């Protein structure tokens, strides 16, 4: 990456905008936004609107964040991953997680995320061991697509296919301008190459390849079904790539995205937008309770 001009430009932008720590004044402004909003207490509101109090049920999804190192440094990242982050799950902790998985029959999905999970030292061992312990489990890899072009990852697509891993890939738009604006110059082209490589080994057909869209700014995503149709048309027509499903995600106002909103003076308006558009239908599927 030292000699990658595109990465250096992205890193420079993040040093100037996305990596600067919030000042005390900015932290106080964020706190005031929440207080002035006058939003109802969440648990009470959840009960009134959805008839749900957030009580947990049997665990079905075991989600593991196995490290924060990433070959990208996106300006919306909720966990502030970047090439400068080196926190990673140890082998001891990975073993404990695998033990929990082996002894939790209610768990049907192992959801592996990061950072770029594929670049973490324990990733492949966790995938292989999961397949041995629980061949019935759906293994999800939260992939940024450009990781497939990283040195040493030339066999990654084959590894994922051989182990029947369900790839959920982030692609915030079907145009190069919008993706590069959020993720850095050249990211869109490398993402398309990653999709093509996955298609070559069977993804988007017999192997599951889903895409995730999240907005580029302080607004809500469009209807999922309509956007999936547009993604399917644009990606197939212009790049010859296919996928299974598209999921739209609403950005959480935390970490780097919250900093971005705060510095643009949009945090209060965005919080109000989220409260106004609270969707009670999503409550039963809340992951973390």
Model-inferred region functions:
Residues 208-258:
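Hydrophobic, aromatic-enriched interface-forming segments
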Residues 2, 226-227, 246-289:
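Accessory C-terminal segments flanking Radical SAM cores
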Residues 1-25:
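Intrinsically disordered, low-structural-confidence terminal and linker regions
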Residues 156-169, 203, 230-246:
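Structural recognition of alpha->loop->beta junctions
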Residues 126-131, 219-237, 264-274:
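Short, electropositive alpha-helical surface patch
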Residues 98, 124-127, 157, 192-195, ...:
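Generic structural signal for well-ordered alpha-helices
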Residues 24-114, 118-136, 143:
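Conserved alpha-helical substructure of the radical SAM core
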Residues 61, 81-89, 106-120, 131-152, ...:
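Core AdoMet radical
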């Amino acid at each position: 990456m030292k000699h990658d001009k595109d990465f250096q430009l992205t890193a420079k932008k993040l040093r100037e905008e996305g990596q600067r720590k919030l000042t005390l004044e900015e932290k106080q402004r964020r706190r005031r936004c929440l207080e002035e909003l006058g939003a109802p207490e969440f648990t009470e509101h959840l009960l009134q609107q959805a008839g749900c109090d957030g009580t947990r049920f049997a665990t079905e999804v075991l989600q593991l964040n196995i490290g924060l190192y990433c070959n990208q440094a996106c300006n919306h990242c909720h966990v502030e991953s970047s090439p400068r982050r080196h926190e990673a799950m140890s082998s001891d902790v990975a073993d404990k997680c695998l033990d929990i998985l082996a002894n939790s029959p209610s768990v049907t999905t192992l959801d592996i995320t990061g950072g770029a999970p594929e670049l973490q030292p324990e990733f492949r061992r966790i995938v292989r061991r999961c397949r041995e312990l629980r061949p019935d489990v759906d293994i999800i890899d939260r992939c940024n697509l450009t990781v497939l072009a990283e040195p040493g990852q030339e066999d990654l697509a084959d590894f994922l296919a051989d182990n029947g891993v369900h790839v959920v890939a982030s692609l915030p738009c079907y145009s190069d301008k919008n993706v590069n604006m959020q993720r850095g110059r050249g990211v869109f082209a490398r993402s398309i190459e990653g999709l093509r490589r996955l298609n070559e080994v069977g993804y988007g057909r017999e192997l599951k390849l889903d895409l995730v869209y999240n907005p580029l700014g302080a607004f809500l995503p469009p209807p999922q079904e309509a956007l999936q149709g547009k993604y399917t048309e644009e990606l197939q027509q212009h790049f010859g790539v296919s996928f299974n499903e598209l999921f739209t995600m609403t950005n959480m106002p935390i970490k780097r995205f919250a900093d971005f909103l705060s510095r643009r003076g949009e945090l209060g308006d965005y919080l109000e937008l989220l409260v106004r558009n609270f969707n009670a239908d999503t409550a039963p599927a809340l992951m973390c309770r």
